[in-house]
Every structure is written in C-alpha cells, then in structure tokens.
Design a protein with these regions (language model features):
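Glycan-recognition and catalytic cores of secretory/periplasmic carbohydrate-active enzymes
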Residues: 1-170
C-alpha cells in the first residue's frame, strides 16, 4: 500500500506490524492460530510472517533490509518444516492414493486439521528471493518441487483426478 498510494503512513504501519511479528511470533517461533479453522500451530502463520518481511525487505535498504530479510528467512524455515519431503503411502481404496497423488511438496495444514493443501500464494517468490539473497539453492529447488506437486491435480484428458471435469481443479 505504501508504494501503491505513495503514503508514508502505510509504511509506518507495516513497520510497526513487523516489530510486533518479530517480538510476538517470529522470535518465539509461536506461529499459532492464524487461521479461522484452527486453534493451534499452523504453517499459515509462518507464511504470513515470511511474506510480510519479504515485502518490507523489498522496500528497505541497508541494515533495515537485512533485518527484514533475516526475519523472512527465519519464518520461512518454520513454514518449510510443514511441507512434505516424502510421499505418504495411502491405503488401497483411498481416492487420492488410487489416483497416484504424491504428497512430496504439499504443505500440511495444522496439527488440528492435519490435511494437505496447496496454500502457497507468493511463498514461492519469497523462497526464490531468499535463494538468491542467501545463496541457498535448496529454496529454489524446493519451489520446483512444490510447483510440480501442485500441478499433478490439474485435470486433462485421461487424467481427471477422480472427480474433475476438464479445466476444473479439484
């Protein structure tokens, strides 16, 4: 909003929010209850924190930029801990298993709801930026895993994912 409207009060509000996120969430690794459907730790809270710090780093310079980048990095590591690095062996007869779904690269939602989803939004861009900034190719590599994993449920002829119609994403 600061850049879009060229209004410094939006930057000040974002900086105060970042201070709060650092003090109450990131420094404590207390990514808790940031969704409407969970009252427990969840990856979404860390995604929000990482993304907020990413955008602040993009509009900052010098030590301030480094601070936001480091906070983004810390929140991103937590977020990544929720992403599957293996394929869950589904029991025979489960639709997603029968359709060959591979869970590697999918994010678990929360300990309360314990299901996978494709909730990522701009986190891929955040990870690619961190990869370049910190010379850490694993971030970029994992973005590729996440991206390819999400595309496996895109329906096409002879691969309708069990419930889909052409062009419909289940």
């Amino acid at each position: 909003a600061y850049r879009y409207f060229n209004n410094p009060k939006y930057l000040t509000a974002a900086q105060k929010t970042a201070d709060y996120l650092e003090r109450e969430i990131i420094s404590k690794a207390d990514y808790f209850s940031s969704t409407l459907d969970a009252n427990c730790e969840d990856k979404e809270a860390s995604l929000y924190a990482a993304t907020a710090m990413y955008y602040l780093a993009l509009i900052s310079t010098g030590e301030e930029q480094q601070r936001y980048a480091d906070l983004c990095l810390k929140a991103s590591y937590f977020a990544l801990s929720w992403y599957y690095l293996w394929d869950v062996p589904f029991a025979q007869g489960q639709m997603i298993g029968d359709n060959g779904l591979q869970t590697r690269g999918w994010g678990n939602v929360s300990v309360e709801n314990n299901h996978i989803d494709v909730f990522i939004f701009e986190f891929g861009s955040v990870l690619n930026w961190l990869s370049k900034r910190y010379n850490e190719p694993r971030f970029h590599d994992f973005v590729q895993v996440i991206s390819s994993s999400m595309r496996q449920l895109l329906p096409f002829e002879n691969h309708m994912c069990g419930v889909a119609k052409t062009g419909y994403y289940p």
